Regions:
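Short, well-ordered, mixed-charge alpha-helical segments that flank or form enzyme active sites
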Residues: 107-110, 158-163, 194-196
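A short secondary-structure junction signal
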Residues: 151-153, 161-165, 186-188, 197-199
């Protein structure tokens, strides 16, 4: 595996030296320290992701992008390289964009870009696997005006780490972004067709409403997600609420916080997915050290969900030092 990664890096650097494109790299690393057991706390240094890629503009209508992501993989070695993006973008006009290949999924891109701290924690849909970061398929973006954008995608549905399933089923979705003074809104709907037929199965739908507010030194954002017929099981509903705030206090320093809450319910009003639900709180401070280098100190607290009448779970608190460096 180490040899493959070395060959990958050398190939990208060599390709860049003979092209007019841009080669880039981004690394996420951290140190985490458990605050739960002061006598014998868990502690760890970790490089969670190393991303390498190359972008090339072919002409004023076509461009290409290839990206590899080296990260942890439960089914592989400690560090496994995946082809994360391999896309061709066609721009027939300055308002229409068509992407083909392994492309970035649009499900959570709006909040991911606004949150802007993927190296600290992914957006809700990403970290909870409601969707994949990227997938093979085709996407269309149409800029109707400076304030209105629509997009649509058809994807394999299995993510960039997997091939298409044997049945050839796909997933699709569409969204709309509305921009006003200092605010942006997105509504979107994603569908995963059922793969089995019967009274207990139905297509899965993810409905998303997201909002962003940006001022001179303050940004706020929030999203509500409702997943109907989760995993194509009829009436298995999942819901999630995620909000964040970021305050710039000067000298390239900002304070930030985030709160996520997830829940579920089936046809009998049971919390069917309770083992994967709860409340997440992140509070921290971030410093832009120089161009391409960010560091953040933060506390992540997760409290697992409990049934009505049960004693509340104890929060699991972790102290993190996160680093992002890109070039």
């Amino acid at each position: 595996m180490k040899n493959y990664i070395l060959i990958l890096i050398v190939s990208i650097i060599t390709f860049d030296s003979y092209s007019q494109g841009t080669t880039y790299a981004k690394i996420f690393s951290d140190f985490n320290y458990s605050l739960a057991d002061v006598s014998n706390p868990y502690k760890e240094f970790k490089v969670s992701n190393a991303i390498f890629g190359h972008k090339h503009t072919l002409n004023n209508k076509f461009s290409a992008n290839i990206t590899f992501d080296v990260g942890n993989n439960s089914s592989g070695s400690s560090y496994t390289a995946f082809l994360k993006l391999a896309s061709l973008k066609w721009s027939p006009t300055d308002r229409v964009f068509v992407d083909f290949g392994i492309i970035k999924a649009s499900n959570f891109t709006f909040m991911e870009n606004s949150w802007g701290k993927r190296y600290i924690y992914k957006s809700f849909q990403d970290v909870n696997k409601w969707s994949h970061f990227s997938d093979a398929g085709v996407g269309l973006t149409y800029i109707l005006s400076d304030n209105l954008i629509i997009d649509a995608q058809i994807l394999n549905g299995d993510g960039y780490k997997n091939l298409q399933d044997s049945e050839g089923h796909m997933r699709g979705g569409a969204g709309l972004i509305l921009k006003t003074d200092g605010m942006s809104f997105r509504v979107a709907r994603d569908i995963v067709p059922r793969t089995m037929y019967g009274d207990e199965y139905e297509s899965q739908y993810i409905n998303t409403f997201a909002m962003i507010y940006t001022a001179s030194n303050l940004s706020l954002g929030g999203e509500y997600n409702l997943r109907e017929n989760t995993s194509n099981v009829i009436d298995n509903t999942s819901s999630a609420f995620s909000v964040y705030a970021n305050l710039d206090i000067g000298n390239d320093v900002s304070l930030f916080g985030r709160y996520d809450l997830s829940d579920s319910e089936d046809a009998n009003e049971n919390q069917w997915n309770i083992e994967n639900e709860g409340e997440l709180t992140i509070i921290g401070i971030e410093k832009q050290m120089t161009k391409g280098v960010k560091v953040a100190v933060n506390v992540k607290s997760f409290k697992a969900a409990t049934l009505d009448g049960e004693e509340e779970a104890e929060a699991n608190n972790m102290l993190y030092l996160n680093l992002e460096y890109k070039f």
